[in-house]
Amino acid sequence: MKIGVLALQGAVAEHLRMLEEVGATAVPVKRVEELDDLDGLVIPGGESTTISKLMHKYGFMEAVQEFGKANKPIFGTCAGAILLAKRIQGQDDYHLGLMDIKVERNAFGRQKESFEVLMPVADVGADYPAVFIRAPYIMEVGENGQVLAKHEDKIVVARSGHYLAAAFHPELTEDTRLHKYFLDMVKEYRS
């Protein structure tokens, strides 16, 4: 399985390492044409407005939308989850609009309110270490979506078909289970 990590901003190297650890061939994606031979894509965290502007500037917005519409799995973490969402609280532009979720940006506070917590994630396991940095939360999941985890009664991991969104940064831990879950999704959609 060949999985790309959108390499415009964020913890790209960390995602690449995690994907390699779970058995994927992981590559940074810096040009639109590099999407062509991928089985799945990770959109890492960073600053969602900045990533969105870079995606527009370099032609990734439409290309990633087509990638998703071709039933290729996409995993968005933190800002990547915001970009995947169909709806963003108080904002209508600068996102992919692929996953049937509604998100609120910076829902757990600013940089200084960052924290780490152990939490259960359905289909992944207990005691998953979740690192929240200026994290969003998922306000709503569409009728075909699945809530995989909550923190303080707020949805922080959801799946809808071939899309996976996490409000936190799984790549900033040593726990590879969520990346393994995504790799299994990619295998499921490839077969």
UniProtKB/Swiss-Prot annotation:
Keyword annotations from UniProtKB, A to Z: Glutamine amidotransferase, Hydrolase, Lyase, Pyridoxal phosphate
Residues forming the catalytic site: C78, H169, E171
GO MF: glutaminase activity; pyridoxal 5'-phosphate synthase (glutamine hydrolysing) activity
Annotated positions binding L-glutamine: G46, E47, S48, R105, I133, R134
Acetylation among keywords: no
Any single GO CC term annotated in Swiss-Prot or TrEMBL for this entry: cytosol
Keyword Ion transport recorded: no
Database matches in InterPro entries: Class_I_gatase-like, PdxT/SNO, PdxT/SNO_CS
GO biological process assignments: glutamine catabolic process; pyridoxal phosphate biosynthetic process; pyridoxine metabolic process
Tree of life domain: Bacteria
Quaternary structure note: In the presence of PdxS, forms a dodecamer of heterodimers. Only shows activity in the heterodimer.
Family stated for the protein in its record: Belongs to the glutaminase PdxT/SNO family.
Function: Catalyzes the hydrolysis of glutamine to glutamate and ammonia as part of the biosynthesis of pyridoxal 5'-phosphate. The resulting ammonia molecule is channeled to the active site of PdxS.
PANTHER family associated with the record: PYRIDOXAL 5'-PHOSPHATE SYNTHASE SUBUNIT SNO (PTHR31559), PYRIDOXAL 5'-PHOSPHATE SYNTHASE SUBUNIT SNO1-RELATED (PTHR31559:SF0)
Protein name: Pyridoxal 5'-phosphate synthase subunit PdxT
Organism: Brevibacillus brevis (strain 47 / JCM 6285 / NBRC 100599)
Gene: pdxT
